[in-house]
From Swiss-Prot:
EC number(s) stated in the UniProt entry for this protein: 2.4.2.10
Transmembrane segments: none
Biological pathway: Pyrimidine metabolism; UMP biosynthesis via de novo pathway; UMP from orotate: step 1/2
Gene: pyrE
Organism encoding this protein: Corynebacterium glutamicum (strain ATCC 13032 / DSM 20300 / JCM 1318 / BCRC 11384 / CCUG 27702 / LMG 3730 / NBRC 12168 / NCIMB 10025 / NRRL B-2784 / 534)
Keyword Magnesium carried by entry: yes
InterPro entries referenced in this protein's UniProt entry, alphabetically: OPRT, Or_phspho_trans_dom, PRibTrfase_dom, PRTase-like
Function: Catalyzes the transfer of a ribosyl phosphate group from 5-phosphoribose 1-diphosphate to orotate, leading to the formation of orotidine monophosphate (OMP).
Protein name: Orotate phosphoribosyltransferase
Record field: catalytic activity: orotidine 5'-phosphate + diphosphate = orotate + 5-phospho-alpha-D-ribose 1-diphosphate
GO biological process: 'de novo' UMP biosynthetic process; pyrimidine nucleobase biosynthetic process
Cofactors demanded by this protein: Mg(2+)
Superkingdom of the organism of origin: Bacteria
Length: 184
């Protein structure tokens, strides 16, 4: 969780919306290969009108002390999070998308959106488990010569992603943890 001051009422409302919309009970296999008795399908919240507005507002608040020009991450989970931040009230912040691999046709880009040359960017994700998805985006951005200032997520599953991201020299913040969703 960020040390920045974020709106506690909005954060509580977001937690309730995610519990209602996105927490699915039943055995599932996570991206890490581990089994869990619930799944947090945060896309059900990031693509919900009210939850999306809260996510954009709260992530802007949580990262207000970070200097970045654009926000994005690995498609698909990061896409609605990035656009929520882009559309939230405040200064202009562009969004971008990082593909898992470059397209084989058209412009053959791996990073889509406005030109990020000389820009500082924030990498985002909907749910962080291992940290591999945001770090895949970080690697692609760094390879393209783009400065990444940090990683932020909506929900952190508390399974070591913070340490993996810190090992890459990046600060990491999350809006919610499992206890906020009644899943500890």
């Amino acid at each position: 969780m960020s040390s920045n001051s974020i709106n506690a009422e909005a954060r509580a409302e977001l937690a309730e919306l995610i519990k209602e919309l996105a927490v699915v009970h039943g055995e599932v296999t996570l991206s890490s290969g581990k089994k869990a008795d619930y799944y947090i399908d945060v896309r059900r919240a990031t693509l919900h009108a009210r939850a999306s507005r809260l996510i954009g507002q709260l992530l802007r608040e949580a990262t207000a002390d970070w200097d970045y020009d654009a926000v994005g991450g690995l498609t698909l989970g990061a896409d609605p999070v990035a656009t929520a931040i882009m559309h939230a009230d405040g200064r202009d912040i562009n969004a971008f998308v990082v593909r898992k691999e470059a397209k084989k046709h058209g412009m053959q880009r791996r990073i889509e959106g406005p030109d990020l040359t000389g820009k500082k960017v924030l990498v985002v994700e909907d749910t962080t488990t291992t940290g591999n998805s945001p770090l895949t985006a970080v690697a692609a951005l760094r390879e393209a010569g783009i400065e990444v200032v940090g990683v932020a997520t909506v929900v952190d599953r508390a399974t070591g992603a913070d340490e993996v991201i810190a090992a890459e020299g990046l600060p990491y913040r999350s809006l919610l943890g499992l206890s906020d969703l009644g899943l500890n």
